[in-house]
Swiss-Prot record:
This is Growth-regulating factor 9. It comes from the Eukaryota. Pfam families: QLQ, WRC. The gene is GRF9. Keywords: Activator, Nucleus, Transcription, Transcription regulation. It comes from Oryza sativa subsp. japonica. GO terms for biological process: developmental process; DNA-templated transcription; regulation of DNA-templated transcription. One of its GO terms (cellular component) is nucleus. A motif (Bipartite nuclear localization signal) lies at residues 156-166, 184-191. The QLQ domain and WRC domain may be involved in protein-protein interaction and DNA-binding, respectively.
Amino acid sequence: MFADFSAAAMELGEVLGLQGLTVPSTKEGDLSLIKRAAAGSFTQAAAASYPSPFLDEQKMLRFAKAAHTLPSGLDFGRENEQRFLLSRTKRPFTPSQWMELEHQALIYKYLNAKAPIPSSLLISISKSFRSSANRMSWRPLYQGFPNADSDPEPGRCRRTDGKKWRCSKEAMADHKYCERHINRNRHRSRKPVENQSRKTVKETPCAGSLPSSVGQGSFKKAKVNEMKPRSISYWTDSLNRTMANKEKGNKAAEENNGPLLNLTNQQPTLSLFSQLKQQNKPEKFNTAGDSESISSNTMLKPWESSNQQNNKSIPFTKMHDRGCLQSVLQNFSLPKDEKMEFQKSKDSNVMTVPSTFYSSPEDPRVSCHAPNMAQMQEDSISSSWEMPQGGPLGEILTNSKNPDDSIMKPEARPYGWLLNLEDHAM
């Protein structure tokens, strides 16, 4: 019977790593043998209650002898010693602690044997270390950045809402955020200067053509002041030259076309404006003894048939016409206070030209309407019309066959736009 017991003790020693355990002889004390056998049986029962894959398959753990030896001086036969032994050997570790301990023991075996450690064993340790670092709010010292914030997903955009949401896009190179969120918190400066220069370049070609609502607003008035069309200056110079040539030229042509010359010379056109510019005085041009006088027969006859019903006062509330006329006068550098209007006197059939341009609500007057610049350009710059010798007055003088047509149709002449009357205003 004792031989069977010694054989069982040797088997327990082989399982638990007690290879150095020798079976004592019968002459030795039986108490020490019983204690060792009891300790081996209890450790085997504890290992059976918590199985481990490493212990069963590879049998790598061989430290059960030092871990579960009984304290010295304890008697195994009493009940309190049995309870103490069960409490110490039943649950020494939790299952997770036991597996981690076996894992570390396996790595130690590789180190002791001077063999390369598999990467699968090391990856599990790094994962456990990261989870413990995030849980304990430790800094990731293993990355080499002691003060860097822990980022579980490096390379991902770090834009968050502060709670749960995080951007799913990848961060740019050497940046924390993606292309969408990299400039989110930057204060935007003013618009670049290039855009402003492009706007001015786009606006400058528009200044050559006057809109229909010229004079409404300071910006549009500034455009009118800056605009200096070459056609108007050319016509003024040519008309002044023709006036000088007319005084020295043929008197026979003047006698034949006397009423026509009076009409063309004394229109409120650029020649009258040039005379006002030389005198620098607002004057009233009456027809008493002046050679530049105009009679109502020569001035108003062409329009009496067509504008007899419309020869009434223009409403004072038409600020549009006033602004248009003021913008046209500024191009001829007239003073601001100089105004001009055409008034038909009741006593004498004389057309006076006072120094005011604006119509008053009291007296029936004929106002000068602002020109349409697009129409003026079409009249002055046409492909089929060539500049005659002597200017527009020379054209009228040479075209002496049909003087009635030129009188009855003032709009056909290049300066007909300056005498647009009530039919254009309405």
